[in-house]
Amino acid sequence: MKKIMLIASAMSALSLPFSASAIELGDEGVLECGPYAKIGVVGGMVTGVESARLDPADVDCKKHLSLTTMLPFGGTLAAGMTIAPGFRAELGVMYLRNINAEVELGEGKTGSGAANAAIDTGAPIRKRFKLTPPQPTIMPISIADRDLGVDTDILAQAAVGQQQLTVEQRAEDRIAWLKNYAGIDYMVPDSQNPNARVVNPVLLNITQGAPNVNPRPRQNLNILDHDQWRYLVVGVTALSNANKPSVSSVKVLSDKITQIYSDIRQFAKIANIEVPGAPLPNSASVEQIQTKMQELNDVLEELRESFDGYLANAFANQIQLNFQIQQAQQQQQQQQQGQVTAQEAAAAAAVRALNGNEQIIQLYKDLVKLQRHAGIRKAMEKLAAQEEGDDQSQVSCNDKKQQAVAEDSKAGSSKEGKNKEVELDLSMIVAQVKLYADVVATESFSIYIGGGVGVARTYGDIDGKSVKHIGVVASGVLGVAINVADGVCVDIDGGYMHSFSKIEDKYSVNAFIANAGVRYNF
């Protein structure tokens, strides 16, 4: 009989979790089965996100600017079911705001209009136009230039006992004439050793003598020999006139200057520099050509000076084109070829002065560095938007500068020599299905672990541009549940949420999250 009573007691105890009273508390007062609702607050720290902006001081273009993230916060609302003692399933929604990140901009040129305007805010850059210096154009060689080339002399060899000059040193002026007028390099990289330079192969092993003489000797061009040099100049001159451009030299020069002005116009607007828009007339005189070249020199130098000191190792070298046609040379051209041809010769000389000009090439390289700067990119896009009609306010450059300074001052983001600019300003709504399991359970509290997966909708602004993004997230938590009353628990947990996709293909927003909530069991 006692055995029967013990068995009955055991069966009664085993059936207890499935009885109606088990929805409340078990033998130890721990909640076992039943539905519940939970509400709470959440806060955290964003991690895994970095600025998409490159550090302009990094010549390798690999280092990104530092990014300072804010502390997001929000609330949670969930409904769930205790499906078995120590196991819960939950469907919850979490709202997070203040997912902000600031990018730290480098030092600017204090007090310069370019630096102040560069901090102007606006829509992010849409498309970065490529900056490439104008390609060299081989111009026809005039008779006066031919004669000048023929008369180009060489340096005398050093006296006995002194260091002897090389062929390249003695013929330096002739080599320069070949490059400037014909685009021919006397010395070229060695195909066998890229670090070495050799005489251009087209000037070597030239067949000598009459065609009917055999064997025919071969000889390298002797650039020091005046007769050989004269024949070379005449041949190059004839070839340049046979292959001359279909348009006039004045038109070629005008197009080159127009291209340069077009490339620098956006930067000039940021620096509040006016870029001339009138091209050279086809009938431009020699004086007009000289004036146009001086105008180009002044604009480029003013632009360089405006950004001097804004970036490290950039805009340091003064621009001096030094283009000037000597009066005697001009008169000689007019006497030999007439006024129109003299204008063409002057324009051709100006084109040669721009061909491969190291100062202009360096300026373009510096502008490419400047183009990567976050503040400059934003200012350029702001100007582009205004030109397209996106911004009808027609705010002047000075007004934009004042507005930018006022906004920086109000936000407290302006520091001596450095500025912080909001790159991300986002909010997030996350819906997840989660499972929890108790690892330690007592009458008064329990320690649990959990994991979930769901969908996150992120929205807000990135660099002033409105964005919306939906992606998959997963999370894991570790927490403690405290029984504060019958059917009421306080859950405190911390965890990590991972995003499987990037916003705008640039930003992966992950977060460490702490949550505190009240769970009420029905």
From Swiss-Prot:
Keyword Cell membrane recorded: yes
Q: Where is this region: Disordered?
A: 385-417
Does the keyword Nuclease belong to this entry? no
| Subcellular localization | Cell membrane
InterPro entries, per the entry: OMP/PagP_b-brl, TSA
Q: Which domain of life is it from?
A: Bacteria
Recorded GO cellular component terms are: plasma membrane
Pfam families xrefs: TSA (PF03249)
Query: Transmembrane segments in this chain: where?
Result: 67-87, 470-490
Keywords attached to this Swiss-Prot or TrEMBL record, sorted alphabetically, are:
Cell membrane, Membrane, Signal, Transmembrane, Transmembrane helix, Virulence
Compositional bias segments (type: Basic and acidic residues): 398-417
Q: State the membrane topology.
A: Multi-pass membrane protein
> May I ask which residue range the UniProt record assigns to the signal sequence?
1-22
| Function statement | May be an adherent factor for rickettsial adsorption to the host-cell surface and a determinant of virulence of individual rickettsial strain. It is the major outer membrane protein.
| Protein name, as recorded | 56 kDa type-specific antigen
Organism name? Orientia tsutsugamushi (Rickettsia tsutsugamushi)
